[in-house]
């Protein structure tokens, strides 16, 4: 049993910038934040490292990909798509929908955090991903296919997809 309390700064993979069509982020990837949100998370990571270096605060940093699962905030991509499709409402996709996300089930994220808490080394950074890279467009179309099987009367659900102007700083 560990005798000390470790401070885990749960960060985001957005600190690394946009995920390309090939490859993935790892602990050696340079920071390249593209939005105020990701810049603030990168700054937080650097602050945690400084506290570790200066005051020997026992810390680790975990950078995780996009979580999904039960009780997720309803404005996030997967739940908002499901809820809107259930109500027969249009589902917006930002830009061309080609933004790639790595999707991680929330229970898998929790299990990874427990592993880091039990076996992680002080001052290290751990990337936690689901190896489920998919474009936003693809995930919404996949949700539509599932909804077509469940709510047959409202098929095809893909007719409810529309594209809107991309948000500033959206990676």
Protein language model features and the residues they cover:
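Proline-centered turn/helix-capping motifs that create local helix->coil transitions or kinks
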Residues: 8, 17-21, 56, 72, ...
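C-terminal substrate-binding subdomain of Rossmann-fold SDR/epimerase-dehydratase oxidoreductases
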Residues: 79, 85-171
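Short, small-residue-biased leader/transition segments that mark boundaries at the very start
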Residues: 1-6, 136-139
């Amino acid at each position: 049993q560990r005798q000390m309390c470790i401070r885990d700064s749960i960060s985001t993979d957005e600190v690394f910038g946009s995920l390309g069509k090939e490859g993935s982020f790892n602990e050696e990837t340079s920071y390249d934040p593209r939005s105020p949100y990701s810049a603030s998370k990168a700054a937080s990571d650097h602050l945690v490292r400084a506290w570790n270096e200066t005051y020997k605060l026992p810390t680790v940093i975990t950078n995780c990909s996009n979580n999904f699962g039960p009780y997720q905030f309803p404005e996030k991509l997967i739940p908002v798509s499901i809820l809107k499709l259930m109500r027969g409402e249009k589902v917006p996709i930002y830009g061309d929908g080609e933004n790639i996300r790595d999707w991680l089930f929330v229970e898998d994220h929790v299990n990874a955090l427990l592993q880091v808490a039990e076996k992680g080394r002080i001052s290290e950074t751990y990337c936690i991903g689901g190896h489920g890279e998919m474009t936003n467009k693809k995930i919404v179309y996949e949700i539509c296919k599932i909804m077509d099987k469940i709510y047959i009367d409202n098929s095809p659900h893909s007719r409810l997809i529309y594209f809107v102007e991309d948000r500033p700083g959206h990676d």
